Amino acid sequence: MKKYLSIILLFITINSFGQTETLENIIKEATENSQLEHLAHELLDVIGPRLVGTPQMKTAHDWATKKYESWGIPSKLHKWGEWRGWERISTQIDMVSPRNRSLTGMQLAWSPSTKKKGVTAELDVMPEVSNKEEFDLWLQGVKGKFVMKDMKQPTGRPDYNWEEFATPESFEKMKKDRDDQTRAWRANLRKTGYGRGSIDKAIEDAGAVGIISSNWSRGFGVNKIFSARTKNIPTIDLELEDYTMLYRMVEYGDNPKIKVISKSKELGVVPTFNTIAEIRGVEKPEEYVILSAHFDSWDGGTGATDNGTGTLVMMETMRVLKAMYPNPKRTILVGHWGSEEQGLNGSRAFVEDFPKIVENTQAVFNQDNGTGRVVNINGAGFLHSYEYVSRWLNSVPNDVTKHIETSFPGSPSGGGSDNASFVAAGVPAFNLSSLNWSYWNYTWHTNRDTYDKIIFDDVRSNVILTAVLAYMASEDDSKTSRERMIMPIDSRSGKQRTWPTQRSPQRKGGL
């Protein structure tokens, strides 16, 4: 008996030493041989933004598969749907009267082009109306004009700037005036009889030559760039400074004119993909640890923090694990999802198309929301998540975990990022939520989401965290519990909330 006990203790000691050595090697590789800056340059500077349906999205998928193959990691493209193919080329906007000035802005995603020589026209702003009849009467006068469809912002300074320098009375007055103006604008829009989605079509059908918008993101020099709703005329987003200048000129009767030359290509129907790569497990190859990050982006910037940084974390984690942990117990699979921005489509397609993998998944680690170090992990509503996630976190270096707050069992995410696709299917999927770094105002879906906003020290920290979590989840002797929490009562309805339901992806988009 003593002999057997000695053998068992020796095995535990050797196994523990082996784990410690592997973890040390993982941390050293992630720290001293980081490839993050180079990967970021190739993805963000050279390939650029990754709007679904664009050639750049396909180029990014091909780049990722080749990169994985160069590291000795088998990879493939998972075709899950089709999308409207489109390519942004260029936008040139100039004020030509009452003076000459180049304006700053761009066409929205999937916007139609102008003709080769562009279009020059006067501008009009949305009128104050009492009802739909008045608005329809106004529409008769927009033929041959650009229509400025968004509210003129009362200030181009973000609230934090006001709070720092304004008197309290001035700050409060500005906020009240802005709130009153916003409420009046929305009420007026309702009186037109159209919504934010349908009013573009009404303006286009009335003969306008283009729509000018300005979706300010409440920060210096930042606008959010989404998609056009027009079919034949361009939709152009102007930065706040130029938009409000033109708006004032219209109000004061200065009759400004602008010239717009916007170029883009319609590419028909194109396939959409996920990039999948895996390090095959040696003991339990049919059980999976999944690393998750959406690959697509909006295209106002280059998609650096949404979600270039999440992509980089998962790619670098796979590189490090392949180098220092090439024979994992369980298969470690990475998914770079397409079309997250249009509704988690890529990850929902994966969950739907690979039910066996989903059924045998140990854990999913997802990273999406920005460049900052991870500061929050919650248990996603899984009752026993505390037991295994906390155990895994204990092996992460303290200088990484000291920033992290955990909450268990947490609550299941119904949307927001790709972890929700797995949670809905009952898989323990954890979002590695990061520090803000002014994400929502300055980089989330904006024209300023670019390489220079990345905090590489924080991203390196996230690689270490993700690599250690993946290693520990792979090595764990036990399979994770999927027992769910009892859902709480909704305070508004008085009814018990339900677990999020699995949804099918949109497999034909923009058509």
Q: Which stretches of residues belong to each language-model region?
A:
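N-terminal signal peptide c-region/cleavage motif recognized by signal peptidases
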Residues: 13-15
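N-terminal hydrophobic or amphipathic helices/low-complexity stretches enriched
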Residues: 17-59, 66-74, 160, 279-283, ...
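N-terminal capping segment at the start of a domain
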Residues: 20-54, 80, 90, 218-228, ...
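Soluble metallo-hydrolase cores and metallopeptidase-like ectodomains found primarily
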Residues: 21-22, 111-136, 220, 225-304, ...
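Noncatalytic luminal/extracellular "stalk/propeptide" segments of secretory-pathway proteins
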Residues: 32, 41, 45-179
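Short helix-loop-beta-strand segments that form the rim/entrance of peptidase-like active sites
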Residues: 38, 320-345, 364
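Metal-dependent peptidase/peptidase-like ectodomains
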Residues: 100, 116, 121, 140-144, ...
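His/Asp/Glu-rich mid-to-C-terminal helical/loop segments that flank catalytic regions of hydrolases
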Residues: 234-238, 248, 319, 439-511
